Amino acid sequence: ISNRIDKQYNPRNDEGERKVLNFRPLNKELDTGDWLILCRTHEIVKQVCESLDRYGWLYKCYGKSIVNDKIIEAIHSWTALQRGKEISGSRVDTVYSFMDSTRIKRGHGTFKGAHSMMYNIDDLINNFGLREHIKEDLFTKTLDWYDVLNAKGVRKRIRYLRAVMRDGHKLDEKPRIEVSTIHASKGGERDNVMLLTDLSYGPYKSSRDTQQGRDDEARVFYVGATRAKKKLIIVHTTEAQFEYEPIFFHDRQAS
């Protein structure tokens, strides 16, 4: 970096770990511990999130849980009804918000009962617009939440939610994994950080052509690398045509 101010740094006593990989280890590597996955661009964040969906990981993206709390409440509430239990009217209202007109009669999309009262399946069918065939189906087959909650907001996430549950995770667990751009991660730290070096053409060209561009990218990746407290995994580009090459300088010198 040009015109940088020298600073005195003192290492910690405990030893950390640094690895350089040619692939994104988004499956087994994430089995334990808290992880922060850092990307240079929003497009790479999107790619990583799609991979985490396929693997069934609970995670946050830009600090926000990927699983909507209302969807979790609706799943738990329907499971209780399915088992013959009663739930509160406020929870019925949440369940109804994730059903379409094939599940609820017209005019009943918003639950009209008292939110403080308790209701079972029969109450909802007899008085609050839940369609009769749902109870019939409960007797003839297992009617799980993914068969019943069919509104658009939950339908597009069913495959992911089932993958999470199939791997033994509870949907209301605190996510151990967070995905973010490097810029959005300032101030945040994790024991384990995975730093993806993929670059889009604009920053890559700037870092090759101008001193200001080189300085800017050096600062960005310095922020990314220093988020790690114990373990840092640096990943070569796997999708983009370009990567931040200076971060691999010492590895190439050693080889």
What are these regions (language model features)?
Residues 1-255:
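The feature marks helicase ATPase cores and/or their adjacent C-terminal helical subdomains
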